[in-house]
């Protein structure tokens, strides 16, 4: 059974950050903010995403001032429905009521 997940990341290295974003897109997750993705994952896909992110992170030895931090958070449909959205992108300014997520 699939569950909705939010995946947040704080990655200082541009190449690593771009690899993570491309990986998450390829796995079918939707980017909802610059460093946040969301999508439905069953347990098998979740393990696959987790393993892939670990592989990406382990490819580079980080310097002392660098960060590679990823947080994967499951959320229920009720929690998602109760979300509070503040703001919109420039293209949504005219259609604030049509914000999907």
UniProtKB/Swiss-Prot annotation:
It is an enzyme of class 3 (hydrolase). Pfam families: CRISPR_Cas2. Belongs to the CRISPR-associated endoribonuclease Cas2 protein family. One of its GO terms (molecular function) is RNA endonuclease activity. Changing residue 19 to A: Considerable loss of RNase activity. Optimum pH is 8.5-9.0. Mg(2+) binds at residue 10. Coiled coil: none annotated. InterPro entries: CRISPR_associated_Cas2 (IPR021127), Virulence_VapD/CRISPR_Cas2 (IPR019199). Its cofactor is Mg(2+). Forms a heterotetramer with a Cas1 homodimer. Homodimer. Its EC number is 3.1.-.-. One of its GO terms (biological process) is defense response to virus. The keyword ATP-binding does not apply. Keywords: Antiviral defense, Endonuclease, Hydrolase, Magnesium, Metal-binding, Nuclease. The keyword Transmembrane does not apply. This is CRISPR-associated endoribonuclease Cas2 1. It comes from Saccharolobus solfataricus (strain ATCC 35092 / DSM 1617 / JCM 11322 / P2). CRISPR (clustered regularly interspaced short palindromic repeat), is an adaptive immune system that provides protection against mobile genetic elements (viruses, transposable elements and conjugative plasmids). CRISPR clusters contain sequences complementary to antecedent mobile elements and target invading nucleic acids. CRISPR clusters are transcribed and processed into CRISPR RNA (crRNA). Involved in the integration of spacer DNA into the CRISPR cassette. Functions as a ssRNA-specific endoribonuclease, producing a 5'-phosphomonoester and a 3'-hydroxy.
